[in-house]
């Protein structure tokens, strides 16, 4: 159908002169507010006349009026199109859903605000928590720069941002084949479709997850201990809503740490207490006496990269047990270990049944799958499932079946082995550059896991890393500073070098650019 016929223009007035003005005004408004986008082809006048119930002469006059004013252009032999550039004095505005004015009503939900409602006035019907700049910045930068399209002219040549993966190396052909096999099996047994969904997650997938985490993370559990989620973020949200009593529950978070996890618990009404980290991970002795929930990345602290030492692991679990607190373990990239003695997940030694283990397939497979999981104590599972059901009944069944087959047939293990080799090479190249070319300014933080390396500023170097990051951006190199991950965005200065999407040539190029910038700006 023609785009013009798909938008809601409202009824066209009757009578030749009235219908002309009515149709003209509505088409002009649709062009100005973007419902008819630049370059949209308008249908022939005969079709428009028939659709809107006017004479063809009326439709012709409307088109000619818009053409004369510069709202549309005519291309010989092709038709009439919405102009790319509107006439002088006219401007396109974002289409906004209007709401009736009145006490407590918002004037518009999106698009530019009216003069009567300045940006400084909060929307009356929105939760004020989500209007806080700290919250919008914590969630905004994290998602926007990963999913918002950017023009080719502004795309980064070298992307050192953390938490990105090299999807170019994912075996899409194998995953498609496995997914098709699983769906064909479901098609042959339609009676099993309902049971294949399951509020707690597809049972075959939960079985496969138990095998996967037992082999890679020494976490031994039953399928009944697993809740399948739409990624790790939904797991954090579920835990926050299940564990937090608004205004009372004290949640300790690593500082610096992962902002979206912090926001999930804050949104549920928790009292957030930032706790520092060092070379051994979370500083356990700094945990508040009244702590109820402790959020930690013990294997590969985000973003600094430290591994929680064995002594601190023992102390952390004992502290949680003695204070009737619980631990949320974020094991976001634990499959990728390169050197050093292996330290198992906290959950693997959880005799006290106080650890909630959060895993994801975003790093070892694809973020687009939106699939994660939560290993929880038996006493909490019923509540967690009920909380999840408030937002969705279950994750995508085809995706769950595809991932289950991918794991069960050994493809995930093979893919992880391949990517571990790829990431190891990139990591070694980065570490060599950090200790060599950049050693005058930066010192890498010892780390054995993951897809990024953090480097702190040496005491002898005086650097404005925020300025350095801005200059690098102008040279098509994207990088994050450590300070942006602190609760108050103040702390030990450093840079984070993600190697998920950069090959060896890009690493060399990015390091060379950074060296030149540091030479000019550092002392």
Regions from the PLM with identified roles:
Residues 175, 351-353, 359-421:
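Conserved core segment of the aminotransferase class I/II
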Residues 221, 250, 255-264, 316, ...:
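A generic "structured core" feature
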Residues 361, 441, 482-487:
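Short, solvent-exposed loop/turn elements at beta->coil junctions and helix N-caps
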């Amino acid at each position: 159908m023609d785009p013009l016929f798909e938008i809601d223009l409202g009824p066209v007035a009757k009578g030749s002169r009235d219908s002309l003005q009515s149709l003209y005004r509505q088409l002009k408004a649709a062009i100005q507010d973007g419902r008819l986008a630049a370059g949209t082809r308008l249908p022939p006048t005969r079709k428009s006349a028939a659709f809107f119930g006017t004479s063809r002469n009326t439709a012709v006059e409307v088109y000619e009026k818009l053409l004369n004013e510069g709202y549309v252009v005519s291309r010989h032999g092709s038709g009439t199109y919405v102009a790319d550039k509107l006439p002088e004095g006219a401007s396109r505005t974002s289409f906004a859903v209007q709401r009736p004015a009145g006490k407590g009503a918002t004037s518009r939900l999106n698009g530019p605000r009216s003069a009567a409602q300045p940006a400084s006035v909060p929307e009356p019907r929105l939760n004020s928590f989500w209007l806080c700049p700290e919250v919008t910045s914590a969630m905004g930068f994290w998602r926007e720069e990963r999913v918002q399209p950017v023009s080719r002219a502004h795309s980064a040549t070298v992307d050192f941002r953390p938490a990105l993966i090299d999807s170019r190396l994912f075996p899409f052909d194998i995953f498609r084949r496995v997914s098709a096999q699983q769906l064909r099996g479901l098609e042959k047994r339609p009676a099993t479709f309902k049971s294949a969904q399951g509020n707690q997650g597809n049972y075959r997938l939960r079985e496969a997850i138990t095998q996967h985490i037992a082999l890679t993370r020494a976490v031994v559990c039953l399928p009944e201990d697993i809740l399948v989620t739409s990624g790790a973020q939904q797991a954090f949200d579920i835990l926050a809503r299940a564990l937090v009593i608004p205004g009372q529950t004290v949640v300790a978070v690593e500082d610096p740490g992962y902002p979206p996890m912090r926001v999930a618990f804050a949104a549920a009404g928790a009292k957030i207490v930032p706790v520092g980290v060092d070379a051994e991970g979370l500083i356990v002795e700094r945990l508040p006496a009244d702590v109820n929930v402790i959020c930690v990345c013990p294997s590969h602290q985000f973003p600094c990269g430290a591994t929680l030492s064995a002594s601190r692991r023992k102390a952390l679990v004992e502290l949680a047990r003695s204070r009737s607190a619980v631990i949320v373990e974020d094991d976001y990239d634990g499959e990728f270990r390169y050197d050093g003695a292996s330290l198992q997940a906290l959950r693997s030694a959880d005799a006290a049944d106080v650890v909630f283990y959060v895993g994801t397939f975003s790093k070892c497979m694809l973020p687009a799958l939106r699939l994660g999981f939560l290993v929880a104590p038996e006493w909490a599972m019923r509540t967690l499932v009920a909380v999840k059901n408030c937002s969705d009944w279950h994750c995508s069944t085809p995706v769950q079946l595809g991932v289950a087959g991918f794991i069960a047939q050994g493809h995930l293990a093979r893919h992880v082995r391949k990517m571990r080799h790829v990431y190891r090479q990139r990591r070694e190249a980065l570490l060599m550059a950090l200790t060599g070319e950049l050693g005058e300014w930066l010192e890498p933080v010892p780390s054995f896991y993951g897809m990024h390396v953090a480097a702190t500023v040496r005491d002898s170097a005086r650097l404005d890393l925020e300025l350095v990051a801005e200059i690098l951006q102008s040279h098509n190199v994207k990088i994050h500073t450590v300070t942006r991950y602190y609760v108050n965005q103040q702390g030990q200065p450093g840079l984070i070098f993600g190697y998920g999407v950069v090959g060896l040539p890009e690493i060399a190029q990015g390091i060379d650019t950074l060296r030149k910038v540091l030479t000019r700006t550092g002392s």
